[in-house]
């Protein structure tokens, strides 16, 4: 009986040693590219492409016929090939805050940003909609607004969030005359913005 017991135990030892090794390898592989695994769960809508920045920690989708362009002081930007005023852009700045809610209540934050940061002195701002959403434990403020000047008006969606020690802003917009036609398409872009852990 002693030989049977020792034989069974010796057969279990290699299996028991392999299990932690396999679990460790699995955890390592899963941690190498957590953003790709996260993005793979989401389906990119038809006629859109995904933009994923693994270094700076964010992702969003944009219309597949748009092209990349340089927009001063922004990390990424895409615009319509033919309608130059339709574009999406993302920028971020460092912050000590941990969550967008640390900035204040939704209504106060959005009102301040639109009136004092986004609008030029000659523009009249109008806020149409604002909402807070939580995705994977991260909080986002999204809002729709129009900036009207004597000669020109633009409409936009903005999504703001805080994570990775950064305050992120995504703005997607168009000329107000085209807004009704393209609004739903541009809302998909604004709603797709996600922070990735870096």
Named regions from a protein language model:
Residues 2-4:
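N-terminal intrinsically disordered, acidic low-complexity segments at the extreme N-terminus
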Residues 62-63, 128:
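Extracytoplasmic/periplasm-facing segments of secreted or lipoprotein envelope proteins
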């Amino acid at each position: 009986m002693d030989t049977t017991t020792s034989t069974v135990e010796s057969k279990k030892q290699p299996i028991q040693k392999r299990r932690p090794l396999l679990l460790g390898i699995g955890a390592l592989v899963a941690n190498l590219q957590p953003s790709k695994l996260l993005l793979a769960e989401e389906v990119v809508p038809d006629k859109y492409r995904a933009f994923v920045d693994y270094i700076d920690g964010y992702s969003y989708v944009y219309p597949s016929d748009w092209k990349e362009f340089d927009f001063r002081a922004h990390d990424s930007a895409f615009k319509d090939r033919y309608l130059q005023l339709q574009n999406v852009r993302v920028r971020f700045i460092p912050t000590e805050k941990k969550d967008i809610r640390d900035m204040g209540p939704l209504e106060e934050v959005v009102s301040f940003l639109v009136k004092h940061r986004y609008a030029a002195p000659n523009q009249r701002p109008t806020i149409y909609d604002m909402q807070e959403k939580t995705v994977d434990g991260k909080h986002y403020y999204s809002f729709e607004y129009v900036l009207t000047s004597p000669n020109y008006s633009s409409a936009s969606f903005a999504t703001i969030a805080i994570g990775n020690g950064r305050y992120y802003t995504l703005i997607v917009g168009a000329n107000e005359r085209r807004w009704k036609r393209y609004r739903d398409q541009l809302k998909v872009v604004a709603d797709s913005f996600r922070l990735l852990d870096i």
